[in-house]
């Protein structure tokens, strides 16, 4: 099962579209309202980071399966400046935009799996999975 849909992130309205897509896919997979909220919050944080720090990128939403489990994978990709200090951005409360600093650590807490790959000057890819229970 690898059914992927993407939303290009270039405006704030694209963040809303990505959230809605994620909620629809989560609902279709059978996630309850609490997990739907977790997924849409994670998408919102990732899409907002693309918009604020990279200027443009995309959010992919993919249905995944592994050893009899079904889940939803979020893939956030951009070709922005990259993240110079990954350890720092994964600290609770860290923000360069004056936000709450819940961003990436919050996404990691909301989802079951989280990976981050960033190369200075080339961009960032973040993948996060929520498994259906």
Swiss-Prot record:
Transmembrane domains' residue ranges: none
Effect the entry attributes to changing residue 78 to N: Loss of kinase activity towards RsbS. Loss of the ability to activate sigma-B in response to salt and ethanol stress while retaining the ability to respond to energy stress
Alphabetical UniProt keywords: ATP-binding, Kinase, Nucleotide-binding, Serine/threonine-protein kinase, Transferase
Reaction(s) this enzyme catalyzes, per UniProt: L-seryl-[protein] + ATP = O-phospho-L-seryl-[protein] + ADP + H(+); L-threonyl-[protein] + ATP = O-phospho-L-threonyl-[protein] + ADP + H(+)
Enzyme class: transferase
Enzyme Commission number(s): 2.7.11.1
UniProt entry tagged with the keyword ATP-binding: yes
Protein's job: Provides the crucial link between the upstream module (communication of environmental stress) and the downstream module (integration of the environmental signals with signals of energy stress) that compose the signal transduction pathway controlling the sigma-B factor. Phosphorylates and inactivates its specific antagonist protein RsbS thanks to its serine kinase activity. Upon phosphorylation of RsbS, RsbT is released to stimulate RsbU, a PP2C phosphatase, thereby initiating the signaling cascade that ultimately activates sigma-B.
Name used for this protein in its record: Serine/threonine-protein kinase RsbT
Gene that encodes the chain: rsbT
